[in-house]
Amino acid sequence: SRTLLLERGRWWEEETDPGVRGIDQSLANASQLGKGLGTKLVRALVELLFNDPEVTKIQTDPSPSNLRAIRCYEKAGFERQGTVTTPDGPAVYMVQTRQAFERTRSDA
């Protein structure tokens, strides 16, 4: 079973930029873990979202204990911004800006 969530607009109450999108993904089949599928999925989703010229930033918030997800997002170009408190508990706030995305594409 796979879950992919996209949110349009504000992810955090402090976020006022209408071009921000939030993502979350889950690969629930344990036999699929560790094969790079999550990273491929996130990279493809980031590229799809940045195809929209209005998208300025993509953000996500994995649990600090979910080291596999944090590494997946880092490999896909997200950077840690710090730890935030959410209704679900603490989370690692991670972002990828359009500028960073375009910079990595031009380096490739």
UniProtKB/Swiss-Prot annotation:
Residues 1-99 form the N-acetyltransferase domain. Gene3D superfamilies: 3.40.630.30. One of its GO terms (molecular function) is N-acyltransferase activity. It holds the Pfam family Acetyltransf_8. InterPro entries: Acyl_CoA_acyltransferase, GNAT_dom. One of its GO terms (biological process) is response to antibiotic. Keywords: Antibiotic resistance, Plasmid. It comes from the Bacteria. Disulfide bonds: none annotated. This is Kanamycin resistance protein. It comes from Rhizobium radiobacter.
